[in-house]
Amino acid sequence: MNEQIITILAEDGTKTSKIRKLLLLGLTHREIANLVTRGNRGFVWNVYKRMRDEGLIVSAGTPTATTTPELDYSFRRKFGVEIEAYNCTCQRLVRELTEAGIEVASERYNHDLRPHWKLVTDSSLNGNDTFELVSPILEGEDGLEKLERVCWVLDSCNVKINGSCGLHVHMNAEDFNITTWRNLLLSYKHAEAEIDKFMPASRRGGSNTYCGSLIQFPDERIRSARNIRELQGLFPSRYMKVNLQAYSRHRTVEFRQHSGTSVLQK
């Protein structure tokens, strides 16, 4: 590997700064994604687009009829996360996150949407100094960068994860139609056995009270649903691997199967 590339990868800077330098070296988006973002080409595309808009990179020009148009991998969707963990007091977390420039408040357990990160208690968690850290609405690459900063703080506070902890991800679903919902549920259901293979035992199958399996629901019942309300009636609990009840409150779909983590790449 080129010595310049090795030096850049070894730097303490952010992924964004490394991507910018590698782009200036002339590496392809795919090469950079494999080196820096574990294959996430959307992240690289966003950095490239920003550099191009700033005039730091000259685009190859207008595509001709024989040129393959450049695909837009940019990530713009709104999302939110809930991180469950233990081994750090809320007081310390508030202090450390605030010092890192993250607006955060410690609150009683609630489902209210806030413009800031909130720390709440959760009776389902085991361990000392348990907590759930809930994000405000995040969006696109900027949201991922904020999440990266939060994960860095959690790591510096030596937070820990056990089998009772989960990572819940909300994705904006305001633009979903019934076909999107059906396809999402059927795809997840049919892939669930494979997804289980890279999840810890505590979050596989239907053994976890807080992330129930979709496998038990017949395909024909999903396909015959005419709207989101009928699908919510089929999946009435929010404690499912794919939670449809979140749509009524937040206009999101919530993915609940992932095990707890403070590692951004996961």
Name the predicted role of every residue range:
Residues 1-8:
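Short, Lys/Arg-enriched N-terminal segment that forms or immediately precedes the first helix
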Residues 5, 30, 34-49:
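Short, basic interhelical loop/turn and adjoining N-cap
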Residues 10-27:
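Short, amphipathic alpha-helical "recognition" segments used to contact nucleic acids or chromatin
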Residues 25-34, 165-168:
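Short, charged amphipathic recognition helices of the HTH superfamily
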Residues 53-157, 244:
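Terminal catalytic/cofactor-binding subdomain
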Residues 80, 120-125, 181-261:
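Aromatic/basic-lined ligand-recognition segments
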Residues 87, 137-141, 173-177, 259-263:
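A generic structural motif
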Residues 130, 160-176, 252-256:
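Histidine-centered divalent-metal-coordination microenvironment in nucleic-acid enzymes
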